[in-house]
């Protein structure tokens, strides 16, 4: 963080961006794993604002085949509500820590944050680019589209909530190992700074994070949002997430990455998404997530 701020925790129990029930329980699982006391032990001012109100899941509709964008009205509703909550936190000079929920919630959080910065940078720590558009998405799952929407392309109603779009050149993708054809082309066309798992293997996570920080500084960003999807981590270690891709970042690599980001004091807001306790092992992924967040906010062994 650029300076020590109080933290507002905002839960978003939304599962509407994808097809697996359980990710809506992510905020509860993360809290149950000890997030609040973990942060308070660091002598941080922590305010848990609870969860935003999300529509109940209509199981029959949720499990059915839907034409076009899945659960679109529900996602608009979640986006609007989250946008207001996050914006209020920033106006009160607080650090918004948003707990998902699936990654479609980033449409609401980042669109709110970008209104308060002139040149926001985004670190997308994820196995996927989330850069699809409806025309190129066979699934219609909006959790595969948030970053593209935030750059100004996508469904009209969601774009209207995003008045200050993210510049593609202000984005850094870390952990990529599953990209659709259209996403690969978009990354190439816009020269988005990208670190695939192959790059991380070659460079090491230390150099990747240091390069990320320096790159965003060179872009003269005035804030940095970290969007951390737990599927960036390898599912053999971090199983409780819905879109698993083998060969991901290790738990230790991720700890080190977040330690370096803490030391940089550059990140001004954060999402933590895609924790699904229904497909986890004894809440292991939520516990890992709490430990990672602790490291990000300055927790050390000694």
From Swiss-Prot:
Entry's EC annotation: 3.5.3.1
Pathway in which the depicted protein is active: Nitrogen metabolism; urea cycle; L-ornithine and urea from L-arginine: step 1/1
Residues the entry annotates as binding Mn(2+) 2: 126, 128, 229, 231
One Gene Ontology term of the molecular function aspect: manganese ion binding
Keyword entries, A-Z: Arginine metabolism, Hydrolase, Manganese, Metal-binding
Enzymatic reactions: L-arginine + H2O = urea + L-ornithine
Superkingdom of the organism of origin: Bacteria
Positions of substrate binding: 128-132, 139-141, 180, 243, 274
Cofactor binding description: Binds 2 manganese ions per subunit.
An annotated GO cellular component: cytoplasm
BP GO annotations: arginine catabolic process to ornithine; urea cycle
Cofactor(s) recorded in Swiss-Prot or TrEMBL: Mn(2+)
Enzyme class, spelled out: hydrolase
Covalent S-S links between cysteines: none
Pfam families: Arginase (PF00491)
Binding-site residues, Mn(2+) 1: 103, 126, 130, 229
Similarity annotation: Belongs to the arginase family.
Protein name: Arginase
Gene label: arg
